[in-house]
Design a protein with these regions (language model features):
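Chalcogenol-based redox active-site neighborhoods
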Residues: 1-172, 180-184
Length: 184
């Protein structure tokens, strides 16, 4: 599996708005509608990437914990599906149900949202404050498939905890690592 690291997304940048199909219930959902009262975590993921599969359980646990605190999670898959049909909307819905995703799983068919965020890999994590200003863009933690490190979500947890405690933005933000987004 080829490794791709996330691109830089400037701290303080405003999250570009979007409206996409939520594959969980086939409704249209915008960032404005789905954002959290205290913050929002945007994650670019897909069904087939081993890096995403490796952290799925932790994502569900973390989302359940932090959504109760006012930080909503929104997952987006932007992979092209002609060559990667396993990342299509029907299978996204199936994965969301099997994994018990407590968050919307949106399909970015045109890849415009991934381009607006300069997303590069799956998983790719962005944390925004209540005004949708970027406070974090980077990795979940140091765990990778087969490196033996436990999935803790420590980097994202630190960013969300700083946000909830009104502390300064974390300066040391390690890029996310995963499968490259499958562009058209």
């Amino acid at each position: 599996m080829a490794l791709t690291t996330s691109n830089e997304f400037k701290t303080g940048a405003i999250a570009p708005d979007f409206t996409l199909v939520n594959t969980v219930d086939n409704s249209l959902l915008s960032l404005t509608e789905a954002k959290g009262e205290k913050g929002t975590v945007l994650l670019f993921i897909c069904n087939h990437c081993p890096f995403v599969i490796h952290v799925n359980t932790a994502l569900v646990q973390m989302a359940n914990e932090y959504q109760a605190k006012g930080i909503n999670f929104i997952a987006i898959s932007s992979n092209e599906i002609e060559n990667y049909p396993q990342d299509g909307p029907e299978l996204m819905q199936q994965v969301a149900k099997e994994q018990n995703y407590p968050f919307p799983y949106l399909f970015d068919e045109t890849q415009a949202v991934a381009k607006a965020y300069d997303a590069a890999c799956t998983p790719d994590f962005y944390v925004f404050d209540k005004a949708l200003k970027a406070v974090y863009h980077g990795q979940l933690d140091d765990a990778r498939p087969e490196n033996g490190k436990p999935v803790t979500g420590q980097d994202i947890r630190n960013a969300m905890d700083h946000l909830l405690e009104n502390k300064a933005v974390l300066e040391n933000q390690k890029p996310s690592v995963g499968c490259g987004i499958k562009w058209r």
